[in-house]
Amino acid sequence: MIIGQFVKKGKMMDTNITSDDLAILTKWDTPTICNALEEIIPERRGYGFTTTHLFSLDPALPPVCGFARTATIQAAAPSPETTEQMVAKRAAYYEYVAATPAPTIVIIQDIDPQPGVGAFWGEVQTNIHKGLGVLGAVTNGSFRDVPDSARGFNLIGGKVGPSHAFVHLVDIDCQVTVFGLTAKTNDIIHADQHGAVLIPPAAVKQIPAVVDLISRREEIILEAAKSADFTVAKLKTTMGQIKDIH
């Protein structure tokens, strides 16, 4: 029952957004995606993204973009559930994570008073999730096994720690909030070493054109700023030219 419940919920989204649409967005870093969203949805300028520094498992990795899979965890004290219940929940979680649509990004909220006492993420979990097609993860909790974790798995978290303590799943397929980013199942998430942002489905196919426009505007400013004869007067002239770029 529990496995079927979560798999069903994980497959509920009916969207015309394809994996190719999301792959295109990985050409740009998360700050660039945020810039584009500010133009497309100006009223959402102040929220929808992480607002605290996160540690990156591998800052050199390119951005990832996928459909959210969510869960909450605790680690400071043992789970009140039986071993059988915990095993069933973990199995249900993996079924949920592997469900379509894909690709996926896992967002895990550590709900302990002091998040990160025990790490959910390490060598085993990064390899399991990568094997299930997950591109990466965002958490306010901790991660460990830095040298041994799955290469290419784009994980950003609240801290690095040595122990998994009593870490256990509390809930899955639920709304979570990680450092200001609130997400639920199948929300579209873009993430890299800078943090993560939620992309409304209606904005996905608009972003490439808006990024192109912003880039052309910024290029004029950058060329002027890097010139040997750069002055405030030249900056003012350049700023005026930007208005004519559409």
Report residues per predicted region.
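Conserved active-site and cofactor/substrate-binding residues in soluble primary-metabolism enzymes
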Residues: W28-T32, G66, F120, V124, ...
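General beta-strand structural signal in soluble alpha/beta enzymes
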Residues: Y47-F49, I107-Q109, A137-G141, L155-G157, ...
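Ligand/cofactor pocket segment of small-molecule handling proteins
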Residues: T126-P147, G152-G161, A165
